[in-house]
């Protein structure tokens, strides 16, 4: 299944596939839609492989992982800065909301560099490959609860965590 927002590219994709891999054309389904609005696909996807527009890469990855439990593996090309944020470890300067939310879904790893020189025209940014291998979610808590906590914890990065979370639990004026 291929999801493509641009109608011209969605129309052209089957011809491109038939030119390069004629045997694969029978297995291709093209959905002309915004990936952020996709809630259903012709078949449940098991992998997400994408070259994502850099400005929406994190929301697209998180949305598709949330929407399709059937996705077990992810390999996406994103802007190098975004890759660094997704793969950041606790304590690093780039660790933040994308890092924590991505880890809710699985093990996140930096899979490699993609030089700007492989593109034409040459962009002003480098790219990186990020892989995610889905793991079972933590028991006893929902994704919405955890993502709400993540949002509160990182909303004011300069505050101490105790202060940032003080209003998170209704009826609890302070966090101990």
Task: Outline where the language-model segments fall.
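C-terminal lobe and adjacent flexible extensions of AdoMet/dcAdoMet transferase-like proteins
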Residues: 134, 151-176
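Catalytic cores of RNA-modifying enzymes
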Residues: 1-152
């Amino acid at each position: 299944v291929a999801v493509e927002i641009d109608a011209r590219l969605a129309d052209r994709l089957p011809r491109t596939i038939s030119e390069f891999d004629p045997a694969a054309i029978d297995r291709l389904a093209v959905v002309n839609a915004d990936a952020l609005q996709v809630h259903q696909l012709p078949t449940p996807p098991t992998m997400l492989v994408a070259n994502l527009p850099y400005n929406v890469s994190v929301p697209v990855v998180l949305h598709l992982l949330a929407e399709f439990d059937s996705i077990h593996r992810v390999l996406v090309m994103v802007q190098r800065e975004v890759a660094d944020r997704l793969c950041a470890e606790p304590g690093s300067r780039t660790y933040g909301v994308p890092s924590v939310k991505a880890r809710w879904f699985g093990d996140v790893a930096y899979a490699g560099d993609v030089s700007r020189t492989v593109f034409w025209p040459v962009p002003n940014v480098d790219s990186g490959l990020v892989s995610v291998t889905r793991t079972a979610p933590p028991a006893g808590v929902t994704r919405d609860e955890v993502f709400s906590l993540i949002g509160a914890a990182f909303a004011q990065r300069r505050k101490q965590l105790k202060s940032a979370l003080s209003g998170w639990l209704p009826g609890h004026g302070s966090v101990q």
